[in-house]
């Protein structure tokens, strides 16, 4: 059974978002959209109301690192 993700799994979520939305620049995504993308991920089991700006920033930065790796490769 795959690991269930929560808001604290920024690295894993960043990888999944990079795979799910490879065409998007994470730094151009609004936090409202990022929140929706995260809660729609398969395996995400976190409480949608438990997110905050710090958790979304951490996810955005993890996604951005994956995005940079893909675009620079």
Predicted feature locations:
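A charge-rich, low-complexity, intrinsically flexible signal that marks solvent-exposed coils, linkers
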Residues: 2-73
